[in-house]
Regions:
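Extracytoplasmic ligand-binding site segments that recognize negatively charged/polar headgroups
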Residues: 50-66, 72-79, 131-282, 286-290, ...
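Mature extracytoplasmic/periplasmic domains
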Residues: 342-415, 475-541
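Juxtamembrane/start-of-transmembrane alpha-helix segments at the extracytoplasmic/lumenal side
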Residues: 567-584
């Protein structure tokens, strides 16, 4: 080989090696870039679901092993937050990744203001009146047809929602559209009075007038929001009408009850103002959340509570062997719901996001997850389970008793209770400690009348909410000497009564038939007045329940003006002698000032 040929061969070899190296390097770069592209593609495949719910209103997990709920359908325990478990379930079910951005709000008005300020969420959980408002404002996305398809295995909501709840959502409308088109229920309940049965009689606790009962001066709490407070006031001032036989036995009782409890006439507003001002002078405090601790500590002996908070309060007190009861006022109770709705500004016609939102509702509506939520937060799920008995078995797990066990020897909390008017209750609490009813109110500041219910000016109120169709199959008879709405006339009930037991029918909720024998719980008789009665009120209580509708702009302004007079100091109540003393003090101060000026001028002249 010639030298020149040898050199050419080396160059050729070098070129080949360089070419191979370049190819390998390019392949590596290509592979790296492809990898980056794959990662980006995977990130793009993740559906972000922005959820906003009430504070402490979902199972956050972290249960201890001894908290495991053992049911025939299997053991239930919350290890992870429920919304984290949803992410894994969604991937396993739909083979798509979803990431839940979970945040909270404190009140319906806070949520509405957050939305008004531009915060964007895909799915939120307001109360019934705020759902009505958002529907009226055309802010919601209707559920897909697939969401209502009971043949789809994963549609746990529509297959398991209580017939009572389903009927309520399907028969109530806003502007001609049913609630169910836009809202899926989450939790529900009634309002009432948690009380200490050793100090407060059940008769006193079974009326809204307990808030002005001076037997419990500075030992009762009331809710610090205009809607709940107004409902109680209307019930109290209309006691004679609402409890009269002619009113209760009227064929259109349910419709008329809702109308009366939503009365915003000037006359009723004036009477409600007077009642709430008297309540303010009698109660320990207006509260939103502190009432539970005040009841458990014994600082107060009765408190206006939502049934879910009532259950929590009774549960916590019972851990310290301190037993509290729950009573629903005889005049009426507010039937409330919290439900999931999808927002247009969040979903934005994104089919994948809507599918994730509807799947989230279905996942938390699965009976075992409904039980997890009920155990963790104390409120009552709208889920009955359909063909799945998990929820009913959970009630039996909590409240059911063996018919062969005699409970007649249990302690009767009504014994040794001295409720005489001479009893001195002041020793149990220091009334001088932190009894500031108006600490959050600054009369010097401008008050935004839209804050409490935040309604826009272009809204039209819906027709009166009517649940008469929902409860028409529920019996009204209230047998004497029994817990309200629970019949104890037959021989088998007499035998149970001898053992301090009772049959507690729950058919209205689980099957839609109040007399369904498959849904009758044998329970400790006291439970009808405690946790069970709060979580699942009797049909008699449901008959006298009413839903509050949302207020239009004019009504909203009127009720807020009333509320300001309740919560702010009312100068009309200042005694005349106080005005006289104040005037004299002002005159004296002016005289001292003038005298000082005169003395100052005379000194300058000298």
């Amino acid at each position: 080989m010639k030298k020149s040929e040898k050199n050419v061969s080396k160059r050729s070899l070098s070129v080949k090696i360089a070419g191979i190296s370049l190819a390998v390097m390019l392949a590596g770069i290509s592979s790296y870039c492809t990898g980056l592209y794959d990662v980006a593609a995977k990130d793009d495949d993740v559906v972000t679901l922005r959820v906003c719910n009430w504070e402490e209103y979902i199972d956050e997990g972290g249960w201890d092993d001894d908290e495991t709920i053992e049911l025939p359908e299997g053991d239930i325990i919350g290890v992870n937050p429920l919304y984290k478990d949803f992410e894994q379930w969604y991937y396993d079910t739909y083979h798509r990744k979803v990431k839940v951005e979970y945040s909270c709000f404190g009140t319906n008005e806070e949520l509405y203001n957050m939305l008004s300020l531009g915060n964007e969420y895909d799915i939120v959980c307001p109360s019934e009146y705020m759902i009505m408002k958002l529907m009226a404002e055309n802010q919601l996305v209707p559920f897909s047809d697939a969401f209502f398809d009971e043949s789809i295995d994963e549609n746990y909501y529509i297959k398991g929602v209580s017939p009572f709840i389903r009927n309520t959502f399907e028969t109530n409308e806003i502007n001609g559209e049913a609630w169910s088109k836009y809202a899926a229920g989450y939790m529900w309940g009634v309002t009432g009075i948690v009380y200490n049965p050793q100090i407060v009689s059940r008769e006193d606790a079974s009326t809204w007038n307990i808030l002005t009962n001076d037997k419990y001066f500075r030992r009762v709490t009331i809710k610090d929001n205009v809607r709940d407070a107004y409902f109680a006031a209307v019930g109290a001032i209309k006691e004679d009408l609402l409890t009269s036989d002619s009113f209760i036995n009227a064929p259109d009782y349910s419709r008329r009850l809702v109308e009366e409890m939503n009365d915003l006439s000037p006359e009723t507003l004036e009477k409600a103002l007077d009642y709430l001002q008297k309540s303010r002078d009698n109660v320990y405090s207006f509260e939103t959340d502190s009432g539970k601790a005040d009841m458990m500590s014994g600082r107060v002996v009765a408190g206006y509570q939502w049934s879910g908070d009532a259950v929590y309060t009774m549960d916590q007190a019972e851990e310290d062997d301190f037993y509290l009861n729950f009573a629903v006022p005889k005049e009426s109770t507010n039937l409330y719901f919290d439900g999931w709705v999808m927002l247009k500004k969040g979903i934005r016609d994104d089919a994948e996001k809507q599918q994730a939102a509807e799947a989230f509702i279905n996942f938390i509506s699965r009976p075992d997850n409904a039980v997890r939520n009920m155990y963790y937060i104390g409120y009552t799920s709208v889920i009955s389970g359909g063909d799945d008995n998990t929820v009913f078995d959970y009630l039996d797990y909590n409240y059911g008793v063996d018919e062969d066990v005699d409970l007649s020897e249990d302690v009767d909390l009504s014994e040794d209770v001295d409720l005489s008017e001479d009893e001195d209750l002041s020793e149990d609490v220091n009334l001088s400690e932190d009894v500031d009813l108006f600490e959050d109110v600054d009369p010097s500041k401008d008050v935004d009348l839209s804050e409490d219910v935040g309604l826009s000016e272009d809204e039209n109120p819906s027709e009166t909410v009517d649940i008469s169709e929902t409860v028409k199959n529920m019996g009204k008879d209230d047998t004497p000497e029994t817990v309200e709405g629970i019949d104890a006339d037959d021989e088998s009930d007499d035998e149970l009564d001898a053992k301090n037991m009772m049959e507690y029918p729950l058919g209205y909720f689980f099957s839609g038939d109040a007399d369904d024998p498959d849904y009758v719980l044998i329970t400790d008789r006291e439970q009808a007045e405690r946790q069970l009665g709060a979580q699942y009120p009797s049909d008699d209580v449901m008959n006298r329940s009413a839903i509050m509708r949302y207020f239009d702009t004019e009504e909203n302004a009127a009720v807020n003006r009333m509320w300001i007079e309740v919560r702010c100091y009312n100068i009309k109540n200042v005694p005349v002698y106080i005005w006289i003393v104040t005037a004299l003090a002002v005159v004296a101060a002016i005289a001292v000032l003038i005298r000082g000026k005169i003395v100052e001028r005379s000194m300058k002249k000298k």
